Amino acid sequence: MYDWIFNHVVDFLVLVLVSYPIVGGIAFIISSIYQRVFNERRQLPAYFDGEPPFVSIFVPAHNEEDSIESTIVYLATQLNYPDHCYEILVINDGSTDATGEILSQLQVRFPSKLRVLTVVDNRGKAHGYNIALGYARGAFILSNDADTKPETDALWKYMSYFKREGGQNVGAVTGNMLVSNRTTLTALVQMNELNSIVGMIKRSQMAYGGLFAFSGANTMYRKAAVFDVGGFQAEQPTEDIAIAWDMQTNGWQALFAPHIRFFLDMPETLRAMFKQRRRWASGGIYVLLTKTGALLKHPIKNLATMPIIIDYAFSIV
């Protein structure tokens, strides 16, 4: 009797594990198409009238001498947003290369636009962001990596989600990643991945009503929402995943805006790509293990995120 039950349970589990990638893939495709056709066009916000809110752009920098100057000059001169309505805060996180010297020169060039916060020892992005929150003048924070350039209208487009009707519940909006360095086969493969698979996954998650993660490279946060969840979790390997879960657990909306584009450099070697993906995977697993309990305490309130949790758990298995 027990053998019969055991064998049938094993057969059922094997069937689930074998069929899930197929069934899950079909569900992702259908839900992403539904999101794009029926929801995105209706939700696409228009530009708003009136004085735009002040935005603080956070740029984390640890040994970024190759890209920091280009990024800061772009942010200071190319964004289509009133100059008096945004600032750039660079967190120089224990850099040992020429990053500090370059930033000093840029401060002379952009004295009213650029501020630099120096962290003596490298403590990570989340730690630097939590320090910068105490200096930020803006009610909204744009997280922007040192090798990332958002499209020129990005600030207007991001802010339109917060300013639209019902936008007071929006905690963060993440944009659409595009690859800027396309010189190696590894980078080209990742370009195709971001343009198709990642966008489809985020659209599918939005169809269910939530997001598994924000993009650490370019996301706009409501500062009040960041404070509401206790800031960025420095102990988490991937703070962008952790804060997405924290915000949604506390009732804030997390949105994906596919029409807001930003361009970033991706790893150009298989070794570097593997290191990046391993960090993403370990961060996702860590968040799953540490945050799922809080979501399950209120399953009805967090119903929209349950399919995302289940999918990620099965993906790990």
Ranges and model annotations:
Residues 1-66, 70-73:
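N-proximal low-complexity "stem/linker" segments adjacent to membrane-targeting elements
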Residues 92-101, 121:
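A conserved acidic beta->alpha catalytic loop
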Residues 69-70, 97-106, 153:
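Acidic helix N-cap motif at the loop->helix transition within catalytic regions
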Residues 141:
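Short aromatic/hydrophobic "clamp" motif used to bind/position activated sugar donors
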Residues 1-11, 34-48, 208, 268-317:
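Basic/Trp-rich segment in TM-proximal cytosolic loops or flexible interdomain/linker regions
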Residues 53-56, 87, 242:
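Cell-envelope/extracellular polymer assembly enzymes that use nucleotide-activated donors
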Residues 73-85:
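Short, acidic, metal-binding catalytic loop of nucleotide-sugar glycosyltransferases
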Residues 34, 111, 117-118, 124-128, ...:
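Long helical/loop segments within the catalytic core of UDP-sugar-dependent glycosyltransferases
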